[in-house]
Amino acid sequence: MKITQERDITTIRQTVIFSASPEQVYEVLMDSEKHESLSGENANISREVGGAFEAWGEHISGFNLVLQPGRRIVQAWRAHDWWTDHYSIVTFDLRTLDGGTELRFTQIGVPPHRFDGHFRGWIETYWQPMQELCDKGSVSDQTRGASAAARQRIDQGSL
């Protein structure tokens, strides 16, 4: 008997413009305390290639594949309720614009039943709160800030 198994996977692509420098955007994503300011949840993020990370109160975990400060982050990334051995690959490419940063985001390997929730989740629990921090001019020093609604979406599996 021969059994084969396939997992359908999907890709998310989003482009976001922030009114902060690429270095500031990079730091919000890679610094544990700043990430906690964004999410309002615990984060433990290694700053080393091969190092592990956990975010959103351990709902998200993975490890760093490529780290180029102020330019690029590539991570093997998974949600706690995905298939045990399944990681997606997330890429954050940062580019300087006049007065800000263009972030090109790609997530390859999202389970199809989670696509809609993750697509919205990046917007609602990362990009919108990051823009709010940028608009306040406090990307680098904002204290815990995610809304209760954003945390509830994480708890419900939207990201």
Kindly give the residue locations of the regions a language model identified.
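Tryptophan-centric aromatic hotspots in well-structured domains and transmembrane helices
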Residues: 29, 76-77, 122-127
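Hydrophobic-ligand binding "helix-grip"
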Residues: 36-37, 43-44, 54, 58-102, ...
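Hydrophobic ligand-binding cavity/cleft-lining segments
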Residues: 1-44, 156-159
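Charge-dense, helix-prone N-terminal extensions
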Residues: 5-11, 20-23, 48-51, 61-63, ...
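Sparse recognition of residues in long alpha-helices and their boundaries
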Residues: 40-41, 80, 138, 146
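Charge-dense, low-complexity polyampholytic segments
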Residues: 44-45, 141
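A conserved amphipathic terminal alpha-helix motif
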Residues: 109-159
